[in-house]
Amino acid sequence: MNGLELSLEQLREIADLLSQRISQGLARDGQEIGCLPTYLALPSGKQSGKALVVDTGGTNTRAALVNLWSHDGKLEAGPNARKVPDGREGAPLSADFFFGTQAEQADPFPRDRPLPLGYCFSYPAQATADGDAILLRWTKGLRVDGALNEKVGKPLQEQLEKRGHAISGLRVLNDTVASLLGGVHLYAEPRYGQNYIGLILGTGTNMAGVFPVKQLEKVDSGAYPSKSMVVNLESGNFSPPHLTAYDDAVDAASNNPGFQRFEKAVSGHYLPYVFNAIHPGVINPEAGTQKLVELRDQGQGEHARTAGQLLERSARLAAAGLAGLAALYPAGDTAVLGEGSLFWGDPRFVETVRATLKELDPERHFEIVKQRDDVNLLGAACAALAN
């Protein structure tokens, strides 16, 4: 036995512990679950206007000109995309190169008028009152020098301005928050109230939630006009019980041992490394999670079984995470605005999440919404236009 199969009781224990960790993060800084305030309310769905958007995730960086209108929007230019330079091999990247490469994706766009900038940045960062954010740590194996504990929006804005773009305002937000905002702009329904969860499960994983400001004890509510706020949980840093010695080995060999334990057990970047710890040399772990899907569906014997167990455990842990967050919400229908290459790329994944949610929280209806491909870009535009 490799310890990858989790019982319903173990999943309930994980969900309950996550609920506790989220409550601690809402109350105080420096907790395992960061619960980073965004100073953004849910959009009404009626926003309109144009914004320049840059979206940098764990795999790709892209730029677009976005035009929003009521409950919809489109890309007027782009997205222009390229692989994120990551510094995973060889020397770490310089910050100038990292941000300059992202700004280059906007080079073909017109520069006929100033536009607000929405920067979707999928790494842990603390929002600041001026719309920027301070990088807390790198995740997903990224290595960039000279950026930790510094603002990330300002250097991108400077690189864009060097290339002739006039920026009228700035808002930095996490990809999970952007996905949530964009999804609500497109799909908001009265039956959900404020019960929305943003979920990213691809190269990395994270959740975003919506909470009454009075629950955010660490936020000065006098400086924020709305009654509720979107919160970037940074849930990938949760340390769940019932992980295995193989998970411990992957963690110890990573560039951030002791952190992002949930992400390392669930997300697309790390699952092949866990497989490699169990069956060394069978696959190249850098080939990605699709290799595990192929092995499960087309392979044979112990290797196929382990690949299937890892993918199923990932989906069941993701469901435990959703149930743990939803336990802090009012009773009622809850929309999960899901995005990510693993979440939708494995044909069995979402159904496993649904089935596990029914086991964990049979009284609550979870509606899993498949997001549009451009939802992060629309969400970043929502944030930029909220200034």
Can you say where each PLM-predicted feature lies in the sequence?
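Acidic, glycine-rich loop-and-beta core segments that form the ion-binding/anion-interacting portion
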Residues: V210-F262
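Short beta-strand scaffold segments in enzyme catalytic cores
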Residues: T61-V66, A178-G182, G198-I200, T205-F211
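Short glycine-enriched loops at secondary-structure junctions
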Residues: N67-W69, Y119-Q126
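Glycine-rich phosphate-binding loop and adjoining helix at the ATP-binding site
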Residues: R82-G100, A125-I197, Q215-A223, K227-E234, ...
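Short beta-strand segments
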Residues: D55, G118-S122, L173, I197-G204, ...
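Active-site nucleophile and cofactor-binding loops and adjacent substrate-binding regions
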Residues: T56, R143-L148, G169-A178, G198-L201, ...
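ATP-binding/phosphotransfer module of carbohydrate and carboxylate kinases, centering on a glycine-rich
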Residues: M1-A81, P85-L115, E161, L186, ...
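Short, internal active-site loops enriched in acidic
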Residues: S122-A127, T176-S179, S341-W344, D373-N376
